[in-house]
Amino acid sequence: MNLAAMDPTTYDVQLETKRVKLTQLFADFDTPELETFSSEPAHYRMRAEFRVWHEGEDLYYYMFDKELNSKVRCDQFLPASELINKMMPALVELLKPNTILRHRLFQIDFLSTLSGEILVSLLYHKQLDSEWEQQAKILKQTLSTQFNVNLIGRARKQKIIFDKDFVVESLNVAGKQLQYHQIENSFTQPNGKVSVKMLEWAIDVTKNSTGDLLELYCGNGNFSIALAQNFDRVLATELAKPSVESAQYNIKVNQVENLQIIRMSAEDFTEAMAKKRSFRRLEGIDLDSYNCNTIFVDPPRAGLDADTVKLVQGYERIVYISCNPHTLLDNLAELSKTHKITRFALFDQFPYTDHMESGVFLEKR
């Protein structure tokens, strides 16, 4: 991470640089004007991870700066939420004099929400015993006088929870309050306010939809739940078990009755749809009964594999959220043969980095 680049006074310039770069990158495609969704210039990250440095009686957070090729002390961290920045000094001052809690502590992770919850994970190079548990309970009680906080201790093959290993985010999305169960150590969108803009964009591009929606790589149901209002039914796939469990929680708490989650990979689902293989996980689910005119994909950095690209081309409308514009380019080389890009967006999830989150909406030619 290049900590020196994180200067809010340069935010607009760096965003414009990304806008120009993304526009030029896709110049060979007939794209509409790029819609650009900005981030807050500071305090935008809902999660942060720090290594812990021990120096005599002192103890502090640090990160590794790749530009300086050295560790940098982080008493505060500008990109992290205000809640994380408030927690950082409060926590470290309680850890410093506590020989049990600080011993062999090597990392601290924070997961916060816009709605005011924070989860703190303490990671150790030692086994956690009853004495540690007693001190951790006291730490949690002390922090709870100032914060809506939960605490986790982690060591090799150990995970001790006080009292929850998740937070519940509450987001106002297009005038509707949505709640999202976000579990520790699993993927969630890091930039809460930009995540809302992404959800609202996806709702807008699919607002006149008919039939059903298929989503691949649905995670904790982030998009599926927001988009369910635009479709008769939603069928979504996700492989990671913790994410599927979070998605089921989110379906229930948001009272979404037209969304079905299947725990399987996009590649396996592609084979099932092509009737190349049958899967026990699909027993009782009649895939042929779904009338999916729209498909939503938010793949990992590697993008869509060739078979999934072929599957996606079979749908009238495609919503593609990409965390890697280069693999999106590769996929669009095929998708553009059958579909036309009618919406194109840049979401600045990660200010002051080269990372560009983008969205395209394609309709069959």
From Swiss-Prot:
Task: State the organism of origin.
Answer: Shewanella halifaxensis (strain HAW-EB4)
* MF terms in GO: rRNA binding; tRNA (uracil(54)-C5)-methyltransferase activity, S-adenosyl methionine-dependent; tRNA binding
Q: Which HAMAP family match?
A: RNA_methyltr_TrmA
* Gene3D superfamilies cross-referenced by the UniProt entry: 2.40.50.1070, Vaccinia Virus protein VP39
Say what the protein does: Dual-specificity methyltransferase that catalyzes the formation of 5-methyluridine at position 54 (m5U54) in all tRNAs, and that of position 341 (m5U341) in tmRNA (transfer-mRNA).
Q: What GO terms describe the biological role, i.e. biological process, of this protein?
A: tRNA methylation
NCBIfam families found in the cross-reference section: trmA_only
InterPro entries the UniProt entry points to: MeTrfase_TrmA_AS (IPR030390), MeTrfase_TrmA_CS (IPR030391), SAM-dependent_MTases_sf (IPR029063), TrmA_MeTrfase (IPR011869), U5_MeTrfase_fam (IPR010280)
SUPFAM superfamilies linked: S-adenosyl-L-methionine-dependent methyltransferases
Q: What is this protein called?
A: tRNA/tmRNA (uracil-C(5))-methyltransferase
Q: Which PANTHER family match?
A: TRNA/TMRNA (URACIL-C(5))-METHYLTRANSFERASE, TRNA_TMRNA (URACIL-C(5))-METHYLTRANSFERASE
Q: Which reaction does it catalyse?
A: uridine(54) in tRNA + S-adenosyl-L-methionine = 5-methyluridine(54) in tRNA + S-adenosyl-L-homocysteine + H(+); uridine(341) in tmRNA + S-adenosyl-L-methionine = 5-methyluridine(341) in tmRNA + S-adenosyl-L-homocysteine + H(+)
Q: Where does S-adenosyl-L-methionine bind?
A: Q189, Y217, N222, E238, D298
